[in-house]
Amino acid sequence: RCFMLENKKIKTALVSVFHKDGLDEILKLLHAEGVNFISTGGTQSFIESLGIPCGSVENLTGYPSILGGRVKTLHPKVFGGILNRRENEVDQQQITQYEIPSIDLVIVDLYPFEETVASGADESAIIEKIDIGGISLIRAAAKNYKDVVIVASKAQYAPLLAMLKEKGASSSLEDRRWFAKEAFAVSSGYDSAIFNYFDGDEASAFRYAGNHAKTLRYGENPHQKGVFYGNFEEMFDQLHGKEISYNNLLDIDAAVSLISEFDDTTFAILKHNNACG
């Protein structure tokens, strides 16, 4: 493969995020590399507060944010900039004809849908936290990973920063494909959460998408591997002992089920899922 085709310079970045913490170092580094920024609303104000020039999506598209912010980035001048194939002659003719700037980096994070559900908010507030523009930007940029870097959550800020420090404002095909994979993990998990909310008590199906959270000491037997998906550290504090194994998790589950039957403070010792003391 041609080296120059695989390594891409980042010239223009679209940034539209809900959570802005941890972003300033990335923005300053990109600015120092001569990258141009396009953004919306609060994110644009945040970028400009760092002393970095930033163009608005509204100026690019010729349309303001409408419908109470429900429609901001959904426009051919935005998505054409992301989806155009740099080596496709017809694509390049069309973006020239319609004056569409190519976008090489997209940084997005999504409205906090799961957190809003967990807060006990009413349905109207929950519905407003179903992201439309952000999820569309993620899918578009990830689809065109051969030309575009997509950063789909603040969990990927650290890998992006490491890449920029190593390579400057450029990326390899391997980098872009990795970020695309992570982006589809974000989008699939987000849609799974929305489905589970609407499915509710019907339980017609269960969709789960999670990150590889915890490697267990071993599986059911020592020669087997085990992995736990979920937020174990948020649910439990391990006070003593070795790393958790699969069988330990089964005992923990049995213990929680047992003590949930009691209103008073309860203590139990379990072995192989059975209370023994």
Task: Show where each model-derived region lies.
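A short, charged helix-loop
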Residues: L105-E128, I132-E174, G230-F236
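Gly-rich Lys/Arg/Thr-decorated short loops/hinges at beta-loop-alpha junctions or inter-strand turns
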Residues: L5-K11, K72-F79, F113-D122, A141-A142, ...
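General beta-strand structural signal in soluble alpha/beta enzymes
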Residues: V15, N36-G41, G55-N59, N84, ...
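N-terminal glycine-/serine-/threonine-rich phosphate-binding loop
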Residues: M4-L60
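Active-site loops and adjacent core secondary-structure elements that bind or stabilize anionic groups
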Residues: A155-M163, G168-G277
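Short coil/turn connectors at secondary-structure junctions
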Residues: K8-T12, A32-V35, L50-P53, H75-F79, ...
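Glycine-rich nucleotide/cofactor/substrate-binding loop typically near the N-terminus or early
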Residues: G42-F113, A205
